């Protein structure tokens, strides 16, 4: 069993039920969350319904193994149909529900059924738009974070330097996410995803241009390089922001160079008219499978031992500085271990917080949840995908 990426902020426990009407439960807490637990064989299903001002605003489901679903209300509510279920109810204040929204905006991208029904009236008009979207899994590995939530990413666009920006926002109750790879001032690749699917290349870039003009869009900037860009474009060739003619000429040149005397210019020109599958078959190239993709990403993006040690020192130092500034704290000792596997950082260890004392009497209690908040914020500044298990000890 793996540890879930999502760490739900603790609420005030209200009670446990084994049956219940959802509307009545929501009215009882007004703001908070409902945890539904169902054990099926050896699998534990967990569903969270987040409520604000008597309305469902967010949903999260996990099977505690390999599946996480964000914003799908139906997926969570169907757990209420099971006989062997436990329903735990927790209250939140405004600060805690807002903290959850800030930490995990994808949870709060719930579909609004009323808006969906209104949009269905214009289905014929929007069919062409929907057909542009690809039903694929988008997985763009990110490198070292340069700046989070920046308002001026363009200051990092330097000649011949590669960067990638990750832009995301919640608009009209829906979550949008996208990536642009820059070489110098030039955007060379783009990908965009929303509830309709995935757009690549120019279509994605147009969507992201509009997002970048929105002051509510969060923009994170990451380091990149030529090698990593080439790997991404091998996995998602349609991400290239090129005119069709430029793209074709580039593909021809690459093919001529790699094939040498085996593939002639005439053959290349002839192959440009056939399908991608036929071309790959003719050249004896197999479509990459998931294992191949994972191997390539693992090889290219795996940080070295020196990089992991440097990352550990940065995170430890910043945690010490942040927690030490909290009222009532006299000292902070941090001991972390960081490893990297399958595109995710795993961070384990202890944070020991010593409280100030006057004549042996503790001056002020320290809230562990606030310490945890500072720790999570620090980690998110440096890595995007991680699992953490950090013990917080207040002395």
Curated annotation (Swiss-Prot):
InterPro entries: DUF2226 (IPR019249). Pfam families: DUF2226. It comes from the Archaea. Residues 246-255 have a biased composition (Basic and acidic residues). Residues 246-273 are annotated as: Disordered. This is Uncharacterized protein MJ0164. The lineage of its organism: Archaea, Methanobacteriati, Methanobacteriota, Methanomada group, Methanococci.
